[in-house]
Amino acid sequence: MNWIEAIILGLVQGLTEFLPVSSSAHLRIVGEFLPHGGDPGAAFTAITQLGTETAVILFFWRDIVRIIKQWALSLTGRVDRKDPDARMGWFIILGSFPIAVLGLLLQDVIETQFRSLWITATMLIVFGLFLAVADHVGKQERHLEDLDVKHAVGYGFAQALALIPGVSRSGGTITAGLLMGYTRAAAARYAFLLAIPAVFSSGLYELYKVLAGKVPAGIYTMGQTAVATVIAFAVGYLIIGWFMHYISERSYSLFVWYRILLGAAVFVLLGTGILTA
């Protein structure tokens, strides 16, 4: 049965990682309804995110290769540091610092108190409303070529909020981008690129801790976690393409309503005792 549960959670991770609905919240909630019931754990969540981030690398590989190449050449002076791709490399590095620092400082809290379903439900609703406001009032005039240091730092701190399940890594970053005046597509694209260093660092660190015996593997074996990760990769790749096409033509209102309704449902389930925090 654990294999089936791992497959289900891999599907959930792949379906929700790139949507502004919080994949960690969904893994936490869905895990409670599975036969073995309970929180899949921060390690399982971080490791399966390696699958979805690999999908990002495959989907945006041309952009990533170009950014890395131009950034590296800018270090030797062979490319002007004002080159858009070289600047993007520096901005991604700069924007990764907030989540790296806060992730280390708050590690114990992230793996315990932050995983309460009461907090998850609250964040789903609150940041759903933030996304609604940002989508409505954002000027949507800026493109990634307009990114500067101030905005890179803003994106970085917004991404750091995703350490709390229910916020959503993409949702928090996209919301910040919209508030800073970026288009829906630009905000989403940068959110996906910015997440790569943070997610790979977190996932590999959690994988190391499990393999080194520093933390228990949790409910699922490494084999089951690996299967979930592969499934998350395949499904996530398909979702990226769909999502980028969707937001090029529509607003984020669908995801706003989904977050609010899901958060409200979790509150009801907690209040009636069907779910435990």
UniProtKB/Swiss-Prot annotation:
Database matches in Pfam families: BacA
Family matches, as InterPro entries: UppP (IPR003824)
Superkingdom of the organism of origin: Bacteria
Topology in membrane: Multi-pass membrane protein
GO terms for cellular component: plasma membrane
Substrates-to-products reaction catalysed: di-trans,octa-cis-undecaprenyl diphosphate + H2O = di-trans,octa-cis-undecaprenyl phosphate + phosphate + H(+)
Key words of the record: Antibiotic resistance, Cell membrane, Cell shape, Cell wall biogenesis/degradation, Hydrolase, Membrane, Peptidoglycan synthesis, Transmembrane, Transmembrane helix
Transmembrane segments: 41-61, 90-110, 117-137, 191-211, 227-247, 254-274
Subcellular location: Cell membrane
GO biological process: cell wall organization; peptidoglycan biosynthetic process; regulation of cell shape; response to antibiotic
Enzyme nomenclature, EC number: 3.6.1.27
Top-level EC class as recorded in UniProt: hydrolase
Listed GO MF terms: undecaprenyl-diphosphatase activity
Keyword Transmembrane helix on entry: yes
Keyword rRNA-binding in annotation: no
Protein purpose: Catalyzes the dephosphorylation of undecaprenyl diphosphate (UPP). Confers resistance to bacitracin.
UniProt xrefs under HAMAP family: Undec_diphosphatase (MF_01006)
Family classification: Belongs to the UppP family.
Miscellaneous section: Bacitracin is thought to be involved in the inhibition of peptidoglycan synthesis by sequestering undecaprenyl diphosphate, thereby reducing the pool of lipid carrier available.
Listed name of the protein: Undecaprenyl-diphosphatase
Taxonomic classification: Bacteria, Bacillati, Actinomycetota, Actinomycetes, Micrococcales
Gene of this entry: uppP
